[in-house]
Amino acid sequence: MTTLTGQPPLYGGSTGGLLSAADTEEKYAITWTSPKEQVFEMPTAGAAVMREGENLVYFARKEQCLALAAQQLRPRKINDYKIYRIFPDGETVLIHPKDGVFPEKVNKGREAVNSVPRSIGQNPNPSQLKFTGKKPYDP
């Protein structure tokens, strides 16, 4: 079981209604390290001040964690965030990045999906492929 560490940002509002559903179902947490104290917008409305060092925020939905990461952390060049699912029994599971490397980064051993081994300039003309049974995305 993973123990999450970090301090919550300075925030005067709510985190989108964890309420009692999080105790009976699941909740999500996002952790990141900030190089300095700075203001950011919460995905559940309002603004908060992330603290220098490790930060930890709980949300009711995974999408709220992803929104915070994509819209607030990445533009600030904070790329060490991790998203966890926390079950009612206390079990914590890392859900993003699943294998420790973000999806858009190259990871040795990760197979390319929907990859065509050519540049855009080498794509065939679709009008020449019409009625041949070949698709423009075929290698």
Curated annotation (Swiss-Prot):
Coiled-coil region list: none
GO cellular component, one term: photosystem I reaction center
Keyword Transmembrane helix annotated: no
Keyword Transmembrane helix: no
Record field: compositional bias (Polar residues): 116-130
Region (Disordered): 113-139
One of the GO biological process terms: photosynthesis
Keyword tags: Photosynthesis, Photosystem I
A family per Pfam: PsaD
Domain of life: Bacteria
InterPro entries: PsaD, PsaD_sf
Similarity annotation: Belongs to the PsaD family.
Stated role: PsaD can form complexes with ferredoxin and ferredoxin-oxidoreductase in photosystem I (PS I) reaction center.
PANTHER family according to UniProt: PHOTOSYSTEM I REACTION CENTER SUBUNIT II, CHLOROPLASTIC, PHOTOSYSTEM I REACTION CENTER SUBUNIT II-1, CHLOROPLASTIC-RELATED
Protein name as catalogued: Photosystem I reaction center subunit II
Organism: Thermosynechococcus vestitus (strain NIES-2133 / IAM M-273 / BP-1)
Lineage: Bacteria, Bacillati, Cyanobacteriota, Cyanophyceae, Acaryochloridales
